[in-house]
């Protein structure tokens, strides 16, 4: 039996780092990439607070790559953005899992920094709707893999 999955992060140090992964999440890969870009480099507690604000529709996520026909959001100098609630909830679960993994290893949860977070496309769940005259319309659902690596910052 082979490896189930790998992480794209190299040089993982189990003494100082913890990681978590969410596989086959039924969220948009494009919005997941945008949220991950915002969270990369944040302290873990700040990232969880940020996601809570996104879920409460108080703070938008700027769209830098997938922003065609997106309206600007309120705020000084804020360009195209959205409130991806479903994506934020899914990524928050993975971040909490990474935090719990770090606590299990004995790392201080207040000193954890997100050094790697990535979203990758998962398999497509294919389906179809029957239509009139014997036809069918495809309904495909995208899935996404999220991986997170946190490191304890020593000051």
UniProtKB/Swiss-Prot annotation:
GO terms for biological process: cytoplasmic translation. The keyword Cytoplasm does not apply. Coiled coil: none annotated. InterPro entries: Ribosomal_uL22, Ribosomal_uL22_CS, Ribosomal_uL22_euk/arc, Ribosomal_uL22_sf. PROSITE patterns: RIBOSOMAL_L22 (PS00464). GO terms for molecular function: rRNA binding; structural constituent of ribosome. The keyword Hydrolase does not apply. Keywords: Ribonucleoprotein, Ribosomal protein, RNA-binding, rRNA-binding. Gene3D superfamilies: Ribosomal protein L22/L17. GO terms for cellular component: cytosolic large ribosomal subunit. Belongs to the universal ribosomal protein uL22 family. This protein binds specifically to 23S rRNA. It makes multiple contacts with different domains of the 23S rRNA in the assembled 50S subunit and ribosome. The globular domain of the protein is located near the polypeptide exit tunnel on the outside of the subunit, while an extended beta-hairpin is found that lines the wall of the exit tunnel in the center of the 70S ribosome. PANTHER family: 60S RIBOSOMAL PROTEIN L17. Part of the 50S ribosomal subunit. This is Large ribosomal subunit protein uL22. It comes from Pyrococcus horikoshii (strain ATCC 700860 / DSM 12428 / JCM 9974 / NBRC 100139 / OT-3). The gene is rpl22.
């Amino acid at each position: 039996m082979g490896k189930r999955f790998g992480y794209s992060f190299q040089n993982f140090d189990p003494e100082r780092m913890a990681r978590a992964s969410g596989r086959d999440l039924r969220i948009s890969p494009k919005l997941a990439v945008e949220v991950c870009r915002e969270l990369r480099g944040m302290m873990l507690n700040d990232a969880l607070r940020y996601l809570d604000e996104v879920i409460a529709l108080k703070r938008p996520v700027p769209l830098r790559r997938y922003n065609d026909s997106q309206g600007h959001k309120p705020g000084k100098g804020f360009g195209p953005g959205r409130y991806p609630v479903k994506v934020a909830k899914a990524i928050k679960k993975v971040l909490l899992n990474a935090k719990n993994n770090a606590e299990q290893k004995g790392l201080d949860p207040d000193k954890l920094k997100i050094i790697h977070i990535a979203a990758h496309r998962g398999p497509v769940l294919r389906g179809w709707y029957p239509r009139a005259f014997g036809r069918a319309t495809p309904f495909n659902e995208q899935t996404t893999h999220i991986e997170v690596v946190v490191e304890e910052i020593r000051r």
